[in-house]
Amino acid sequence: MSSYAIVEACGKQMWIEEGKFYDFDKLPFSKGDVFSLSDILLVKMDDSAEIGQPYLTDKYSVELRVLQHFSGPKIRVYKMRSKKKTRKTFGHRSKLTRVLVQSISKKGVAQTTCFM
């Protein structure tokens, strides 16, 4: 198994691995931008694991590249009061950003990147 990390982004904690893509709530970056996450909770590399208390910001970095912005699936909500003629339907589509995890690396060590 390759290295993985548990990071906190957009108010959620996510398990991420190198070379895979994930969907986050809309991020303020353009398509193709590369950025790094600062809230890293846990990192597992090869045979060692490190847990932050609460974060590993100064030891590790996670590089991500924005692939695209898109709308998520449509969520439909139907409200009704029984025995009344009150009915209401509404819904929404969340704005999402798809990112590719390029590398999970220790700071100060040569970075390995994933080419896709």
Swiss-Prot record:
Chief place where the protein resides: plastid
Gene Ontology molecular function: any one: rRNA binding
Domain of life: Eukaryota
Compartment(s) of residence: Plastid, Chloroplast
Entry keyword Hydrolase: no
Pfam families hit by this protein: Ribosomal_L21p
Keywords: Chloroplast, Plastid, Ribonucleoprotein, Ribosomal protein, RNA-binding, rRNA-binding
GO biological process: translation
GO cellular component: chloroplast; ribonucleoprotein complex; ribosome
Keyword Cytoplasm: no
Record InterPro entries: bL21-like (IPR028909), bL21-like_sf (IPR036164), Ribosomal_bL21 (IPR001787)
Assembly information from the UniProt record: Part of the 50S ribosomal subunit.
Function: This protein binds to 23S rRNA.
Family of this protein: Belongs to the bacterial ribosomal protein bL21 family.
Classification via HAMAP family: Ribosomal_bL21
Name used for this protein in its record: Large ribosomal subunit protein bL21c
Source species of the chain: Emiliania huxleyi
